[in-house]
Amino acid sequence: VERKLISSKCEARGRVYIIDLLQFTNGCFANISEDQNGKMGAITVSIKTGERATSSSLIPESKGSIFAGMIGELLADKLHGIAVVSLYLREELDTDSMKTLINEVRKLLKKD
């Protein structure tokens, strides 16, 4: 079983995020944390079935739950499988920060 851990540090609007992707042949675990030490947060599971990816929150949180679903569906779609996403935020994300984080996740996927 091929596994690959890819990590990145990303800054958006003065906030620092750690992104970790642990890839498997049929999906990945992703952790996005607004903490230097990396913290677990709200958990969302996404899966690609047919042409679509769908998400479900296992551990919901008020900050960023829609964003976690977006990241999960992006990963499930690109990797043709299952994505489990943990998102830890200190405060709500603005649109520019979301775009920056999505672009960073896409860059990490290209390092494949």
Task: Describe these PLM feature segments.
Residues 2-78, 82-92, 98-100, 104, ...:
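Conserved mixed alpha/beta catalytic, RNA-binding, or beta-rich assembly cores of soluble enzyme
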